[in-house]
Amino acid sequence: MKELLWQSKSELAGPEPSQVNGFAPPEEEKLSKSPDLRAFIQKLEDAGRLLRVKETVDWKLGIGRWSRSRHKPLLFEKIKGYAGQRILTNGLVDPTCIRLALGFEIGIPWKEVIADCTYRLDSPVHPKMVRTGPILDNVVPASVLDLLQFPVPQWSDYDTGRYLGTWHLNISKDPDTGQRNAGIYRMQLLGAKRATISASRGSHLARHVENAEARGIELPVAVAIGAPEAMAIAAAAACPPEMDEFDLAGALQKQAVELIRCGGLEVPAHAEIVIEGLIHPGVRVEDGPYLDYSGRPNTNPKAFLFEATRLLHRSQPIFRGCASGKAGAEDHQLFAFLAQLNLLNLHASKMNQTLQNFFWRRRAFRTAQWVGRMGSNSEKRK
C-alpha cells in the first residue's frame, strides 16, 4: 500500500503571491465555488452516467482494459496496492458528458451546444487569481517526493511502462516573452521523481524548451492532474491568438478559472494533483512505446526529461487519466468536439490535418484513426 506523504498548507514555503516576480497580479479574490472534478463526478452520478467500480482493479493493465471495454465514465474505488485511492476515466466519453462538463442541460441538441460554444469563444473570460485553494491541502517537498505513491496506470499491453500524463495540463512560460501555455503532452513515469514529456516540434512547449536551452537554463513546468474538465478541453485546443488556454476554459464554462501562484507559474487552485518541476536543457530520453489515439503504438526517441521538485495535492486526491487507442474513446470525443469548434491541431502535415479534421467533425472515428496512422510520428499531442 502506498501512503500519501504530506505537509499542511501552513508549511508551504515561498513568498506571498504579491511578491512573486516583483509584481502583484492585477486582481486577487477569495476562492469561490468552482466546477471542479469532484463536482463533475457528482453531475455524472446525478445524471445516471457514472459507474463506480467497487471491485479491486490492477493499475497494471486492468484500468485500461476496463476503460476500453465500457463506454461510460468509470470511477475506480479499489486499486490494487493503493488502498483508499481513486481513478476517474472516460469522463468525456460521449456528447452527454461534454454537455455536463460545460454546464449544458442533457437534452439540448448537439448543434446548439456547438453554436453556443462557438459564441462563447468570442468572449474570453480571464482567470481569477486566488491566494488559497484545495490544491494546497498537502504540500510534499522534494526530499520525500515520490510519484509512485499515486496509482499511475500502465494503460495497455503495448505500453512500455506507466503513464502519468494522459489527461492533464503541462503549464509553462516562454522564458523570452513570459507567454503562458497549458497543453496536454503525454508523460511516461520513469521513477519516483522523473518522467518524460513528449511534445511535437511545432508545439508551444517545444518552443519554450528551445528558448530556455538557448539561454542554458532549465524550464519550470507544472503538471496539473484532475483539473476542471474545461481546463483539459482548453489545454488540448489550438487556442485563438488573442487568448490563452485559461481564457478559453473560462469562456467554455462561462466562469473564470481560479489559479494560484506556485513559484513563477499559475496552477489550477482546484486541481487534484499538481507536480512542480523542471525540464533539463539539452537532455532527451526515449518515450514509449505507447498506445496512441490512432490505435497503434508509437515511440518518441527525443522526449524531454522532467524532474519533479515539489508535489501538491488535495486530501484523498482523485487521479484522472485516459485510455487511448479505441475508436470513439474520450480522446476521440474531445478531438471531434474541438474540430467542430475549429480548435483542433494535431501538428500533422497540412494534408493529414485537413483529412483528419474532416472526419473528426463527422465523428468518423475509425477513419480518423486510419488517417492518423498515415501521418504518425509518435508526437500526437498538442
Segments from the language model and where they lie:
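Extended, highly charged
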Residues: 4-8, 21-305, 309-382
